[in-house]
Regions:
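Contiguous, structured surface segment used for ligand recognition
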Residues: 1-90
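Aromatic-lined carbohydrate-binding surfaces of glycoside hydrolases
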Residues: 21-25, 34-41, 45, 70-71, ...
């Protein structure tokens, strides 16, 4: 995946580097030189990508950012005069929260997500929250439980409000979402997770916290608690842990 990253940064750039992946008990990267090529060595693709970012910033004078993930590398790369090594004992480098997915990322397509995953790898992130498509799971589950399309749309929030929906704060606000939305989100999440796995990034997929639609007692006969309102919004109910 690092060769692909290099090609996305600057077409043809992968031919200027030697990428070496070796085993190590700790995450590390090394910069080295073999002839006219720069060597980036690490124990996994994220470590190697982090080493690439270090080289670009401190040797080539190139800084990549959210708004600029491409650059023109020099025809002859600055040499690494002596081997440089960096390692970390911080095994888990987390990224994102639920609000981020609604504030900033609600309408990202694959092109934008690809850049973000590259950016994660360049900065050593290996544990990002991956909640795209959670609404698809809810749609499918509620359908199997007998909820109608209209009822489901009253529960699932619109794209810009799903962070607060998934935090059990509101229902349905900003919806309903078209059928095409769910198809697109399912396909997008599969591409996101696939690319993360290629890098060795471990997506944090949401578990189940006990949230159910506010009418789950009447519709499904469940033992739930009514959490009331949040800032004037009707909140989902909570499934009681003693419910069989």
């Amino acid at each position: 995946p690092v060769q692909g990253l290099l090609e996305r940064i600057d077409k043809g750039a992968s031919r200027k580097f030697i990428i070496e992946q070796v085993k190590s008990p700790t995450d590390f990267f090394e910069l080295d030189q073999k002839g006219d090529k720069v060597v980036i060595r690490g124990n996994n693709p994220v470590s190697i990508a982090t080493g690439l970012n270090w080289y670009l910033k401190y040797y080539a004078g190139i800084q990549l950012s959210w708004n600029g993930m491409t650059a023109k590398l020099p025809a002859t790369l600055p040499a690494v005069p002596r081997k440089e090594r960096h390692e970390t004992e911080l095994n888990y480098r987390y990224d994102f929260n639920y609000c981020t997915h609604s504030y900033t990322m609600a309408f990202w397509d694959w092109e934008r997500w690809e850049k973000e995953i590259d950016w994660m790898a360049l900065h050593g992130i290996n544990l990002p929250l991956a909640v795209v498509g959670t609404d698809v799971v809810w749609y499918n589950v509620l359908s199997k439980l007998g909820y109608s399309k209209e009822e489901i749309n009253e529960f699932i929030a619109g794209p810009a409000f799903q962070g607060w929906w998934l935090m059990n704060n509101l229902e349905g606000w900003g919806g309903p979402n078209p059928d095409s939305w769910y198809k697109q989100r399912e396909a997008l999440q599969k591409r996101i997770v696939k690319r993360m796995n290629e890098y060795g990034i471990h997506p944090v997929l949401p578990g189940y916290s006990g949230m159910v639609p506010h009418n789950a007692k009447e519709r499904l006969g469940l033992n739930v608690s009514d959490p009331g309102l949040w800032c004037g919004y009707r909140r989902p109910a909570f499934l009681q842990p003693t419910d069989p």
